Design a protein with these regions (language model features):
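Short Pro/Gly-enriched coil loops immediately N-terminal to beta-strands
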Residues: 123-137, 149, 184
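Flexible hinge/capping segments at coil-to-helix
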Residues: 127, 138-155, 169-170
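Ligand-binding clefts/hinges and TM-proximal coupling segments of bilobed small-molecule sensing domains
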Residues: 5-43, 161-183
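Conserved functional loop/turn residues at catalytic and ligand-binding sites
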Residues: 106, 154, 195
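A bilobed periplasmic-binding-protein/Venus flytrap-type ligand-binding module shared by bacterial periplasmic
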Residues: 1-4, 134-146, 209
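Ligand-binding "clamshell"
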Residues: 117-132, 172-174, 209-210
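Extracytoplasmic small-molecule ligand-binding "clamshell" domains
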Residues: 1, 16, 21, 42-121, ...
Length: 210
């Protein structure tokens, strides 16, 4: 249900958090004051919801040294919890395994960074709440300045959505190989070390890493 987000959008809370963590307001959720009043049955207070989140996607969601989670999604989830009178438990999942995690009962819902690449027939998807594109990033001193110059080269990605973006652009047939990395920090470390020639990332977080 997105009524909670629509109410928070009307309050300006989502825009505030987006600007705080991403430097820009990327939100696209409809604003609807008093949206929760439209529910036929009001939420039962005291419920615990297990949310599947990605780790290593700073500043969207990433674990801290003490084991807690920080970032845009945890802060927004806390605001939703306050609206509903619920508590949340975060479960780290791989974004490519959302349907399996939901089907097994390990999580009640998944809150991803920006996009979902699986079949929409196996899960119920909410409308997008962040405007996002994928970007191809190279080192500042790289000699690769055009897409065509990456022919036969190594591209680093972190998940299937980045691979889908690569395929949509037609570059998957041109590059030499595509390597998966655990998270964006590992992806950029590989780029800096020269282990890959470019990386594909969500545009909403590109400013954080560059």
């Amino acid at each position: 249900n997105t009524l909670e987000l629509k109410e928070l959008s009307a309050d300006g809370q989502i825009s505030r958090l987006s600007a705080q963590y991403l430097g820009t307001d990327y939100t696209c959720m409809e604003a609807l004051p008093g949206a929760l009043q439209l529910l036929e049955t009001q939420p039962e207070p005291g419920r615990k919801l297990r949310i599947g989140v990605q780790d290593g996607i700073a500043p969207i969601s990433s674990s801290r040294d003490d084991g807690s989670f920080g970032g845009l999604i945890p802060d927004l989830a806390q605001l939703v919890a306050e609206k509903l009178g619920w508590t949340f438990e975060y479960m780290v999942i791989n974004s490519d395994n959302v349907a399996a995690e939901l089907g097994s009962g390990n999580i009640d819902c998944a809150w991803m960074a920006a996009s979902f690449s699986g079949s929409s027939s196996s899960v119920s998807l909410s409308p997008g709440w962040l405007r996002n594109t994928h970007e191809l990033v190279v080192r500042s001193d790289s000699r690769y300045t055009r897409k065509n110059s990456l022919k036969g080269k190594v591209i680093g990605i972190t998940d299937a959505t980045a691979l889908a973006a690569l395929k949509e652009s037609g570059m998957d047939a041109k590059v030499g190989s595509v390597w998966y990395y655990d998270d964006l920090s590992a992806c950029f470390a590989a780029l800096a070390a020269g282990d890959c020639d470019a990386v594909v990332i969500d545009g909403i977080v590109s400013g954080y890493y560059m």
